[in-house]
Amino acid sequence: QDKLSGTYLITGIPERKNIDGINQNFNSSIILKPDGSFDTYQKIFLVPFAEYVPFFKNWITKMNQFDDIGSFYPGSEYKTFNIDDFKASILICYDSSSPQIVETMVDNGAEIIFIITNDSYVGQFMPYQHFQLARLRAVEQRVPVIQSANTGISGIILPSGKIVYRSKLNERTVFTMEVPLYE
């Protein structure tokens, strides 16, 4: 129990919110804090046909028994989270493919980027490209990037682009290290 004291947990969750009387489903991440509080981030860059069906909401919602199914809604907040004495942002999957999303989060104060992902639906080749996108974001924004993949490739990348840890494809592993915020 003492080993976990002061530990933060970041994971993915499906999240439902009722906004202005409309049920909205989000692909979200949650950060659980040591004091029992939490915060969430809603994925901004949704993948067509995987997380939403284009134009689906426009016609299916006219049949009111289907008012809350069909797809995720995109998030709109570029959040940073305080973790002890530094600020972090959490990206979900292909949020990391958008330089604008990462740049905005860093502009908002993020000193480190966490990427949580599930690359199971993209075959054997794309997880390698996805990891290289994480590396590109680290170099572009000069911040460390930690990618945690339940399928795909996990790793720790320094702002220089140096990979200090990289798992094998789809490897279940635990790796811990102190990540410097500035290389």
Show which residues each predicted segment covers.
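Enzyme catalytic cores with a strong preference for nitrogen-chemistry domains
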Residues: 1-183
